[in-house]
From Swiss-Prot:
This is Transcriptional repressor NrdR. It comes from Chromobacterium violaceum (strain ATCC 12472 / DSM 30191 / JCM 1249 / CCUG 213 / NBRC 12614 / NCIMB 9131 / NCTC 9757 / MK). A zinc finger (unnamed) spans 3-34. Its cofactor is Zn(2+). PANTHER family: TRANSCRIPTIONAL REPRESSOR NRDR (PTHR30455:SF2).
Length: 152
């Protein structure tokens, strides 16, 4: 690694330690040219997949869009923000576990619906009505039957 002080391309690692949580490595380095010491940290570069929209264009995964979807569906419902944050964390974890560079917006929508079904049945129906573009009452009753069936 290049020296942070003089730019020398060769430095020596004096000490390496794993962080307490195991997520990074701290390295103490010395430059043989200028004899200065500095610390570097090595962490895994984990990125969320790109979202492929239904129209075919791609965009960066935006956790705030997911949070907004939850908050709209859960508006005036008795669900704590802690539970919402945990649900969002589960979605992010699932997306990372997929190990894919791209994921469809449909997959994310289904993940949101699954989490809402766990959190609040009314919020699930609210979200489903917009997400699936319900056109009449029968689609609402179908969604209600679906959620009732899954909770038994």
């Amino acid at each position: 690694m290049k020296c942070a002080f003089c730019g020398n391309p060769d430095t020596q690692v004096i000490d390496s330690r794993v962080s307490e949580d195991g997520s990074s490595i701290r390295r103490r380095r010395r430059c043989p040219a200028c004899d200065k010491r500095f610390t570097t940290f090595e962490t895994a570069d984990v990125r969320m997949p790109q979202v492929v929209k239904t129209a075919g264009h791609r965009s960066e995964f935006d956790i705030e869009k997911v949070r907004t979807s939850f908050l709209r569906a859960l508006h005036k419902r008795p669900v704590s923000t802690t539970l919402v944050d945990e649900a969002i964390d589960r979605i992010c974890h699932k997306l990372l576990q997929l190990g894919e560079r791209e994921v469809s917006s449909r997959q994310i929508g289904e993940m949101v619906m699954n989490e809402l079904a766990r959190l609040d049945k009314v919020a699930y129906v609210r979200f489903a009505s917009v997400y699936r573009s319900f056109q009449d009452i029968s689609e609402f009753t179908d969604a209600i039957k679906e959620i009732q069936k899954s909770s038994h």
